[in-house]
Amino acid sequence: MSIEKLAASRILRPVRSMNKGSNERWFEYCRTTCPICGKQGWCMVNDSETKIICGRISSETVFGEAGYLHIVAEDQKRGYDFSQDQMIKEHRKKNDYTLDIIYTLFLESLDMRDEHIKMLRGSKRRITREVINVRNYKSFPIKPWDTTKELIKKVGGKTSYIVGIPGFYAKETKDGRYFTFAGRRDSLLIPQRNIYNQICGFQYRIDDPEYMTVVKNHKPSFKAEVIEQPNTIEVTYKINGKIESIFKDKVDVKEWYEINYEGEKLGEVQLKLESKYIWISSGGRFHGTGVGNPLPIHVAVPSRELKNWERGELIKKDNVWISEGSLKSDIAAENLDELLTNEEKLMYGTTVVSIPGVKVWRILIEPLKKMGVKQATFALDMDMITNSDVQRSLLECAQTLYQEGISINYASWDINLGKGLDDLLLNDYIPAIGKVR
């Protein structure tokens, strides 16, 4: 099996060692569910399947910024294949200074296609051409291998400069290998800026998300794939040493289907729409690099401020907003600057710090301390606030930030006025602010 097919077929995604100097490998539950919380994404299992790091269900042991450590019971083991032929050589992510240089050179070779300009300037987002240029949004390249080749020429023809940069990897062909950039051609690249205005990653927004399969409670060698969009799937299983097709049909979205063979349950499969916003990563690909260790935060400021923010300059703010989604945070920062009074700007600020998910709130601590933040206002999408996992994470975050001398507010509003802070502000409303005590 080629490296590309191996990466695409995985239900577990390899991540780097969680401990320096350790040979223990960890794998993220990508297209299968975590046995602890029953959800996909964020959670990880080690290569002996004896430990799980769950990002949602707490335990007595906090495992760094990743989540909580759980010991795997025998009946929770699923018998995944962790053999060496499942491993792919990837590289440790380079520092933010280097990422910024390479990503900036990469963006210089890209342009904006009409469909993305129309999407950003439309009534739903109302982003001007000037702001599009200032924020350096770009369309994903149609021929990423050519763009990567051009970048390699810019850095003196040395591929070593792009190794260790998430997104870049070596593609395997019958004629050899060449470097290219991972992602979807039908997407918009959204730069992630750190507290020094360095581009340290990208999210990409997919124009037309496709359906994908998720499996749970399954036996080894149980696999499910979408063979025809939107909803025709095929399930395969190894029987007497041979991979056999045991189910092929159209299925309903979000329904769990139990798959049996000769009276024995083999697993369950669900069809769901892939996320519209995805991190640029080449983890699990040959000479690729994962986006984590650590995951990037994104610091969104109004475009008038971004124009004058020098690269490498530490941003200092007394007050910030905390939200999710980099594009949404860019829009929120722009509209906070327009809608808030001068007094409100002094009280709450117009800087929005975007995190990859509320469960990874720990990655906020050091950046907020370096920024000199005294007060943070959480403004998560209103449909998330009733989620018990979100509530627990917010409480833990508030307690930790309070211990660091940072007071916490929460923003709330009628969901009928907009799901997210960006939607609310675009409808010319501002949220109610409450203090967490």
Named regions from a protein language model:
Residues 145, 300, 426-429:
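Short capping/connector residues at structural and topological boundaries
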Residues 151-371:
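Phosphate-handling DNA/RNA-contact segment within nucleic-acid enzymes
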Residues 1-187, 209-234, 242, 248-252, ...:
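Non-catalytic accessory segments of DNA primases and related replication-initiation nucleases
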Residues 46-47, 203, 380:
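Glycine-rich, histidine-containing beta strand-loop boundary motifs that form or position
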Residues 39, 59, 125-126, 195, ...:
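Residue-level marker of positions within ordered structural domains that often coincide
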